[in-house]
Structure formats: C-alpha cells, structure tokens
Amino acid sequence: PIVRVIARYLSEHDALLVEKTLLWKLGKQLTNISSGHYAANFRPHSSLHKKLSGFDYQNGLYYYNVGEGETRCWNDYKKYGFISAGGGVQWRDQILSFEEGDVVAAYLKGAGFVGIGRITAIAKPVRELILHGKPLLSYPLTQPGMASNVHNDELSEYVALVDWLATVEAKDAKWKAKSGLYTTPLVKASLDNQPDTVSYLESSFNLSIPALLI
C-alpha cells in the first residue's frame, strides 16, 4: 500500500520526517523507500515498544491469578500446560481476553509467583479442550472438580493452553514480603506500569521479559 501524510503548517522537511515515522510504526509489512540521513535514527521493528508503558503492540505481559480450589490446581497447570478460570461470567470473560502469544506470570495466593509462560491457544470451555489427542477431562487431574458445570457456558471452567518457560513448585514460590510487588484478586491484570514487579520476575525466573514479547 501507499501511505500519504496530509498535514498543515509543516515544512516539507518536517512532513517527510512524520511520514517516515508513521511508516516505521506500521510495521514490517511496509517498506520505507525514503532513507536519507534520518534512517539511522529509526530503531529496529519490535524493539522500542517493549519498554514503553501503554504502547500498542501485539502481545502483553499479564499477571494471572491461579486461584486454587475445587476446580483448579497449580500442579495440574504445570504438568499439563494450561491455565483456567470460570464459575461465572466475570471470571470467564477475563480468561477469554488472553490472546495467543501473551506472556503470563502465574501468582498463587499466599505463596507467590510460581511460573512464567506463553499462551499458545486461547481459552475454550474445558469440555472442548483436547490435549495431545485426548480430552483434558480424561487425564488424572489433581482437581477433577474441573468438570463441574461442564455443560453450563456461564459457569463452566475455561482453559487456555500455555507453554511454561519457567516454573517452580508451590513451596518454592517467588515472593518478597513488604516489597510492593503487584497482586490483585482479579484473574488477569496487565503488568504494564509495574516495573518493580517485572524486574523481580526477571531476576527470580532468570528470564528477559522484553525478549518474550512479540
């Protein structure tokens, strides 16, 4: 496609610079054929946005609340590669908002952070989830209560698949008391604007968060 910038009260020189910037932002599919002496000032694609709070990019880093109980268990999540939420539309809708490629930091209430992973398949009702050719509910889950309300779309558990990049047992959860680390009772929350928590996650799990984001 051809992109043309229309602006008022800009010199030709300034308008060209604005146009070049917009072309850069529009991504890898467009080529900026006007190079000039400003070319060296443009960062590589998919780099600057990873360090800018609130920048619009494809995937994000999110806090995920494990919420252990009768229908969910961290051991199951870690062993089989998934996360879940359900029991009501307010929790269902939160897990449905995860996108493929999002990075999640799993938090276990009363313990700390227990894993970092990448969403590989968006959430669907647990009754529809097939894992390695078998229904998830056919596996020997620690919490078989996951099958509760399986035919009720409002109350059913919803499951998203995850590729765990780093995990620990619940007893080894990563936490630092009175340090201001971010937590919330929500199922999902952005870790944008939480630099201290992100830094703690990176050091605790020996991962570079920007390198994980697409």
Could you describe each region identified by the protein language model?
Residues 1-54:
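Structure-specific nucleic-acid interaction/processing domains
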Residues 28, 39-69, 84-90, 127-214:
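Contiguous surface segments at macromolecular interaction interfaces
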Residues 95-99:
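Short, well-ordered loop/turn sites that connect or cap secondary structure elements
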Residues 113-125:
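Short beta-strand-centered aromatic/proline hotspots
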